[in-house]
Structure formats: structure tokens, C-alpha cells
Amino acid sequence: MKILIFIIASFMLIGVWCKEGYPMGRDGCKIPCALNHKFCKTECQAKWKGSDGYCYSTGMSCYCTNLPENAEVWDPNNNKCVG
């Protein structure tokens, strides 16, 4: 039973440290890319050191991983994109 609680607690901690999402430009829109992973990685690391990023081919937008909890990312429910 103790091991089960430990595993559940570990997954909860991993979720806290592994925020992901689309970074936003100044206009509140997702940052577009054309399958250029290096560009997206640079964009993600410029905003949040230690993060990683890639070009998400389905949405043609940069996607960042390993973000800090306070990182502001694009939210489809609260879309502020004016472009």
C-alpha cells in the first residue's frame, strides 16, 4: 500500500514540473513555424531557460516542453489572439 501511495505522489510531482504548451507572441497568438525545430527550440529557451521546443506539425506552431509552472502559454479557452 505504501508503494502505491509513493507512485501516485511521484506522478503528481512529475506533473508539476513538466508543464507544456504553445508559447505566445506579443499579439497573443501561437508562434508559427514551418517544421523548423531549431527555431522553436531557440524561442522556447529564450523565454524559459532549461525548456525545450519543437515545431508541432499538425498546428504548424512551436510547442514548448519542460516549462516552469509560472510559464504563460496559449490557452484555447482563453484565446487572446488578435491576428
Swiss-Prot record:
<comment type="similarity">
    <text>Belongs to the long (4 C-C) scorpion toxin superfamily. Sodium channel inhibitor family. Beta subfamily.</text>
</comment>
<dbReference type="GO" id="GO:0090729">
    <property type="term" value="F:toxin activity"/>
</dbReference>
<dbReference type="GO" id="GO:0006952">
    <property type="term" value="P:defense response"/>
</dbReference>
<feature type="signal peptide">
    <location>
        <begin position="1"/>
        <end position="18"/>
    </location>
</feature>
<keyword id="KW-0732">Signal</keyword>
<protein>
    <recommendedName>
        <fullName>Putative beta-neurotoxin RjAa10f</fullName>
    </recommendedName>
</protein>
<feature type="disulfide bond">
    <location>
        <begin position="33"/>
        <end position="55"/>
    </location>
</feature>
<keyword id="KW-0738">Voltage-gated sodium channel impairing toxin</keyword>
<feature type="disulfide bond">
    <location>
        <begin position="44"/>
        <end position="64"/>
    </location>
</feature>
<keyword id="KW-0528">Neurotoxin</keyword>
<dbReference type="InterPro" id="IPR002061">
    <property type="entry name" value="Scorpion_toxinL/defensin"/>
</dbReference>
<dbReference type="InterPro" id="IPR044062">
    <property type="entry name" value="LCN-type_CS_alpha_beta_dom"/>
</dbReference>
<dbReference type="InterPro" id="IPR003614">
    <property type="entry name" value="Scorpion_toxin-like"/>
</dbReference>
<keyword id="KW-0964">Secreted</keyword>
<feature type="disulfide bond">
    <location>
        <begin position="29"/>
        <end position="81"/>
    </location>
</feature>
<comment type="function">
    <text>Beta toxins bind voltage-independently at site-4 of sodium channels (Nav) and shift the voltage of activation toward more negative potentials thereby affecting sodium channel activation and promoting spontaneous and repetitive firing.</text>
</comment>
<feature type="disulfide bond">
    <location>
        <begin position="40"/>
        <end position="62"/>
    </location>
</feature>
<keyword id="KW-0800">Toxin</keyword>
<keyword id="KW-0872">Ion channel impairing toxin</keyword>
<dbReference type="InterPro" id="IPR018218">
    <property type="entry name" value="Scorpion_toxinL"/>
</dbReference>
<dbReference type="InterPro" id="IPR036574">
    <property type="entry name" value="Scorpion_toxin-like_sf"/>
</dbReference>
<dbReference type="Pfam" id="PF00537">
    <property type="entry name" value="Toxin_3"/>
</dbReference>
<dbReference type="GO" id="GO:0019871">
    <property type="term" value="F:sodium channel inhibitor activity"/>
</dbReference>
<feature type="domain" description="LCN-type CS-alpha/beta">
    <location>
        <begin position="19"/>
        <end position="82"/>
    </location>
</feature>
<dbReference type="GO" id="GO:0005576">
    <property type="term" value="C:extracellular region"/>
</dbReference>
<keyword id="KW-1015">Disulfide bond</keyword>
